[in-house]
A protein has these predicted regions:
Chain B
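Alpha-helical transmembrane segments of multi-pass membrane proteins predominantly involved
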Residues: 1-502
Length: 517, 502
């Protein structure tokens, strides 16, 4: 069974989704929770049997799909993808568990199960076409979730979401076909296997073009400034569960793909584009933070702050050293937990008041103390308070980039502090002061079902903030392999310098992480 | 005194005619049956046609076996040419016809199917297409083309609605113009080279090194225009949406596949040597027409309010996409053409069949046209299975993995990449993105809007019978599980295309 655990993880939810059509409407919620829990337990088991001392791929499976054209179903997991898979399973579980009263709940749960298949598939795929397959397929359930259960502008938002990503990914597909063609020219064999591509050293001019092609696909997904305009719409219109999954998992596909594809395939191009991308990332951090401050809608605040933090992830990724990349991967998890939780929290209040305008609230801390507490913890995590999960990721990302450029890191760091302002302002508007609105006086505090979703998230936020080692260890091992691959593959002198050789830095890195936490 | 010609039967190699003769004999058989006992039920003719096509398919498989053993077969004074292209395209022609013909067994009675002539004409048309693809001779191509087209005009007109007559007449006039262009173009080449055989023309032109380039240009322009009409390349496409709208949905789906593959094969035979002749302007003309066809058809499809018209424009766009294969002109691209078209047949026939089963006998008051977008609003609520299948076909047409057409698109774009047409590859990719919008539009209507009129869902399968559902089931399975067969299909097609020297 262990040989096929990844395939089981990928296809179990889909199979369960198909069978779900038979399940009665009244029992579908329990069915969904049960399936998602099994999936989560399987994912935890994967972590348990995962050997964290191995840097390469584990539990690899290979089935020939179109061998004449070099397309095979290859899946595998390493420290980089492991935790995102677990996160995906986790969020589907608590997402389904916390699902409020929804119309057509059966369709929703089946859709979520299919979405889970595509999410796990993206992070486990080791063949570019299989990756592309799940990547594209993930758009469909999300399109349906936003379009069918969303707000008044839901159709515009869902179509915009679909077309933006679809257009970007098609450019990426051309890039993938080129990559396979270069591999064919070099070896005489077609292959779309990522691990095969890793061995291919491309001239710098090719790298630049291919990097741009892949960048189009990934940057729209992340979404990076200036391609971010679809995201506020999608978040603004999506139902709570849609926003949670979108922010926690789907956006991570883009940042994950940067680490899986762009960096190891095109190390020279990554160095070449390091500063432009870092500048974009910093614009993203500052600009979206300012936009977030101007929002009246609390969900938009969370949405923009989520984009803002994605900028830090990009910055860490393009630090191109072990600290930065490890930090960015950790931050992906952290961002998933925290922004997912924030969207859930916004959903809680929306369920009660059917409005998301902050001016409608005020003094909620008196009425809903438990809600206010959890919101407060998540908010502190979001602004990156030490001893919360986000701090570890942000700190490492910035530390990584500090080695490349002091000034840009300083800018980014300041921006993150500024980010605290809008979050605190939003918190103040909503929770402090006196209760002004009559409707707010008798709001019910979070109920058991909501606590079931929120308490685990709170615990994770604090636990991994204090003791991030269980995650950092395996991530670090795999990232070291990626960075040393990049160092070996890079052609130009500048790239060799920018991407440090791991062997030399190893002692430096492992020690601080070991002691500090 | 003329001495009697002395020809041995062996040298005629009549086996090359067998696949065409089977539908012809079948058509005559149907007429004879009608002669003895008229007023038979349509199911008899449908099943007879299906059986005849089945026999034809087996005969083709035999021919394919001979081809893979001995290579290209010539026959009947070397007029017939059975090479890989001929065999592959005949497989598509006959296979798609077999999928089409059971669609006549609708729940509602449409009167064209009560005539045995419909089925006889249908089989004659297939024979015409088969002749068209299985020869190198411009005259026989012309004869095949006209046989098939004339039969097709009649089939459209038999739908017996005002719009059908309009469509048939429009198609007829446009077809006549195209035929004129074709014969004129052929004449120019005959005048230049003294031959109507494409390989002879190529050899002679090659030998004198394209000395009369001006005349070659004239000939090519006429031929291109004539294929433009047949393949509905922009700007010769204007008839397509109207004709599709006028004919029954099933026939429209059929027209988007079978006549086009026949025309593609002929275009491939003619333009193959011209592209490789190194005459730059030809490449430019083709490049431009490919890009314009893809892009403009997509843009027009965006603004349609009727699903059938949208699908008409979408099939124009797909034709432009596939035409790129002829421009690229490598073995991979030519294989990609057939590969794409096989997958396209499944998906497109499936989606037109979905329109066909929702066809009402009379137009309700609140509907502008037979298949307006509004009709499909909120379909997921009332007919979830049908809506899901329709969405599946739309996603496949949009090129979403892992559905059938994605593999075709991927292979086609890859052939552009390997053929050195980087910009074209990008244009093709971006066009797929544009196309995503209008396919998505139907999905949005079906899944995200509320039903406009309460109809209880029976509208969407008003016309459904077991045989229609079977065809849709086959198309859906072919669309979903294409990835299982992609490898074998690709190997098979590539071997055939490669062995015929394209």
């Amino acid at each position: 069974m262990l040989d096929h655990i990844l395939s089981i993880l990928i296809f179990f939810p889909a199979l369960a989704g198909v069978l779900g059509f038979v399940v009665n409407k009244n029992s579908i919620r329990s069915y969904g929770v049960a399936v998602a829990t099994i999936e989560f337990v399987l994912a935890l088991w994967l972590w348990f049997v995962f050997d964290s001392n191995v840097s390469g791929m584990q539990f690899m499976e290979q089935i020939a799909l179109i061998p004449t054209f070099g397309i095979n179903y290859i899946v595998g997991v390493d420290g980089i993808s492991l935790f995102i898979i677990i996160l995906a399973a986790f969020f589907t579980m608590i997402g389904i568990a916390s699902l409020g009263e929804t119309k057509d709940i059966k369709n929703m749960i089946i859709t979520l199960l299919f979405l889970q298949m595509t999410m796990v598939g993206v992070f486990a795929a080791l063949d570019a076409i299989v990756f592309y397959l799940f990547w594209e397929l993930s758009l469909v359930p999300m399109l349906y979730i936003i379009g069918a259960w969303g707000g008044p502008l839901r159709i515009y938002a869902s179509v915009k979401f679909f077309l933006y990503t679809f257009a970007g990914s098609l450019v990426m597909l051309v890039g993938m076909l080129f990559m396979a063609y270069f591999y064919y020219q070099a070896t005489g064999e077609w292959s779309f296997a990522i691990l095969d591509w890793y061995r291919l050293i491309l001239p710098e001019s090719f790298q630049l073009w291919l990097f741009v092609a892949f960048f189009m696909g990934f940057a729209i997904k992340v979404p990076m400034f200036p391609f971010h305009t679809w995201l506020p719409y999608a978040h603004g219109q999506a139902p709570t569960i849609g926003s949670v999954i979108l922010a926690a998992i789907l956006l991570k596909m883009g940042t994950y793909a940067f680490i899986r594809f762009s960096l190891p395939l095109f190390p020279d191009a990554s160095v070449y584009f390091m500063y432009p991308i870092a500048v974009l990332a910093i614009i993203m951090i500052i600009y979206t933070a300012m936009v977030a401050y101007a929002q009246k809608d609390v969900k938009q605040v969370v949405a923009y702050s989520s984009v803002s933090h994605m900028g830090v992830i990009i910055l860490g990724t393009f630090a191109l050293n072990v600290e930065g990349i490890t930090g960015s991967i950790f931050l992906m998890i952290a961002h998933g937990v925290v922004s997912g939780a924030l969207f859930l929290l916004v959903g809680v209040i929306y369920d009660r008041r059917h409005t998301k305008y902050m001016s409608e609230f005020g003094g909620l801390a008196h009425v809903m103390p438990r809600y206010a507490t959890i919101f407060g913890v998540m908010l502190m995590a979001s602004v990156g308070l030490p001893l919360t999960i986000n701090f570890v990721g942000e700190f490492l990302s910035l530390l990584g980039f500090y080695k490349q450029s002091h000034i840009l890191t300083l800018l980014a760091g300041t921006a993150i502090i500024v980010g605290a302002i809008y979050m605190l302002a939003a918190y103040k508007k909503m929770f402090f002061g006196v209760v002004t609105k009559e409707e707010n006086k008798h709001l019910k505090d979070v109920n058991k079902r909501e606590l079931l979703a929120l308490i685990p998230l709170t615990i994770i936020t604090i636990w991994l903030g204090i003791y991030p080692k269980p995650l950092l260890g395996p991530i670090n091992t795999s990232v070291e392999a990626v960075v040393s691959l990049m160092h070996e593959k890079s052609l130009s002198e500048e790239a060799k310098q920018r991407i440090p050789s791991v062997a030399k830095d190893m002692a430096l890195i492992t020690k601080p992480t070991g002691e500090a936490h | 005194m003329v001495s009697p010609a002395n020809i041995s039967m062996e040298s005629l190699n009549l086996i090359t005619l067998v696949p065409m003769l089977i539908p012809i004999i079948g058509a005559l058989l149907i007429i004879i049956v009608d002669l003895f006992k008229s007023e038979q039920d349509r199911s008899l003719y449908v099943m007879l046609s299906l059986l005849i096509l089945g026999v034809d398919f087996v005969a083709l498989m035999d021919t394919a076996g001979v081809f893979s053993k001995n290579g290209t077969i010539m026959g009947v004074f070397d007029v017939m040419l059975i090479d890989g292209l001929a065999i592959l395209s005949q497989f598509i022609v006959v296979g798609a016809s077999m999928l089409f013909i059971p669609l006549a067994l609708t729940h509602k009675r449409f009167h064209e199917f009560t005539y045995p002539e419909f089925f006889a004409l249908f089989l004659f048309m297939i024979a015409g297409f088969q002749f068209m693809v299985a020869t190198d001779n411009l005259i026989l191509i012309f004869v095949g083309l006209e046989t098939a087209s004339l039969a097709l005009y009649t089939l459209i007109a038999m739908h017996n609605r005002d719009k059908s007559f309009e469509a048939a007449v429009k198609y007829f006039t446009m077809g006549a113009l195209a035929a004129g262009f074709f014969s004129f173009g052929s004449m120019v080449f005959y005048a230049l080279t003294g031959s109507v055989e494409i390989n002879q023309i190529a050899a002679v032109l090659e030998a004198n090194n394209y000395a009369d380039i001006g005349f070659v240009l004239v000939g090519v322009v006429f031929l291109l225009a004539s294929f433009g009409f047949k393949l509905s390349m922009v700007p010769f496409h204007t008839w397509t949406p109207d004709v599709y709208e006028g004919s029954s949905a099933a026939l429209a789906g059929y027209m988007s596949i079978v006549p086009k593959i026949a025309a593609f094969v002929v275009a491939m035979r003619i333009f193959e040597f011209l592209i490789h002749s190194g005459v730059v302007w030809l490449e430019v003309i083709l490049y431009a027409s490919v890009v314009i066809t893809m892009t403009m058809a997509n843009v027009w499809a965006l603004v349609q309010t009727d699903v059938k018209r949208m699908l008409a424009y979408s099939s124009i766009s797909h034709a432009g996409f596939v035409m790129a294969a002829i421009l690229i002109g490598t073995t991979q691209s030519n294989s990609a053409l057939f590969f794409y078209w096989v997958l396209f047949s499944f998906t497109n026939l499936g989606s037109f069949s979905m329109l066909w089963i929702s066809r009402q006998k009379n137009l309700p008051a609140h509907q502008q046209s037979d298949h307006s977008y509004n009709k499909f609003a909120g379909m997921i609520k009332t007919a979830p299975v049908a809506a899901t299948i329709m969405a599946l076909f739309m996603l496949s047409l949009a090129g979403l993995p892992p559905f059938a057409l994605f593999w075709g698109k991927m292979y086609m774009i890859s052939s552009a990449v390997t053929g050195g047409y980087t910009v074209l590859a990008l244009i093709m990719a971006l066009n797929s993105a544009i196309a995503g919008y209008y396919y998505l539009k139907l999905i949005v209507y079906m899944f995200m809007k509320e039903p406009i009129v309460e109809n209880g869902g029976h509208v969407y399968s008003a016309n459904a019978t077991l045989s229609l559902k079977t065809i849709i089931g086959i198309a859906a399975i072919g669309t979903i599980f294409a990835f299982v067969a992609v490898n074998q299909l690709l190997e098979f097609i590539t071997a055939f295309v490669y062995n015929s020297g394209y």
